Regions:
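Short, well-ordered secondary-structure micro-motifs
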Residues: 54-56, 105-108, 136-137, 163-164
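Short, small-residue-enriched loops and turns at beta-alpha junctions
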Residues: 102-103, 157-161
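Glycine-rich phosphate- or other oxyanion-binding loops that anchor nucleotides, phosphorylated ligands
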Residues: 92-110
Length: 189
């Protein structure tokens, strides 16, 4: 079984307060991944912060308000939201996470007997930001499922800068996370 985890494809990371041209360039690849994956094998995370984000530990280190719950920036970008709607992905598979990595995501994966029993399990991650939330969730998946193939599709990920994306991919490879399509990112062209 192959699980797809779509990480934080939210307006604020694509076109909003922390948006980049690299993030905008991967939207189509993320949508393609969603379209080719059965709905029951898709999980989605959303970075979720309170209004007082700037007073949190993260806010002190990254003083840019983003993904504030209830705002447009918190919503998934329209193309991704539409693809998930067309696939009829269950709302229970959408995880609001207040941190970079989601323990709730891991708990949901571990509570599924089919996933736990699968000796050929593959967990693929796509989304934003390669060096923060994709990296954190990929490492959590590798720790929770050490015998699974944890895969990151580099062509469906972007980071704050191309250099930080490359650094994150190198770090994930050290942790035995498979990186596919590195060098084929649409924003490299």
């Amino acid at each position: 079984m192959k699980i797809l985890i779509v990480v934080d494809m939210q307006n604020d990371f694509v076109t909003g307060s922390l948006g980049t041209k690299e993030a905008q360039a991967i939207v189509e690849n993320v949508v393609c991944k969603i379209k080719e994956t059965p709905a029951e094998q898709i999980y989605v995370t959303q970075d979720t912060h309170p209004e007082q984000y700037l007073q949190t530990k993260e806010g002190l280190h990254l003083p840019v308000a983003h993904c504030i719950e209830g705002t447009n920036g918190h919503c998934l970008c329209p193309a991704v939201e539409q693809a998930l709607k067309e696939k009829q992905v269950d709302a229970a598979r959408k995880i609001q996470k207040p941190t970079f990595g989601s323990m709730e995501l891991i708990e949901k994966l571990r509570s599924d007997e089919k996933i736990v029993a699968d000796s050929n399990l593959q967990i693929e991650l796509v989304g934003l930001c390669t060096g923060i939330c994709v990296l954190s969730n990929a490492i959590l998946c590798k720790a929770a499922f050490p015998e699974a193939d944890v895969i990151v599709d580099a062509a469906a990920c972007a980071c704050v800068t191309p250099a930080s994306h490359d650094t994150a991919l190198a770090a994930m490879k050290l942790c035995q996370i498979e990186v596919e399509k590195e060098g084929k990112e649409p924003w490299r062209n």
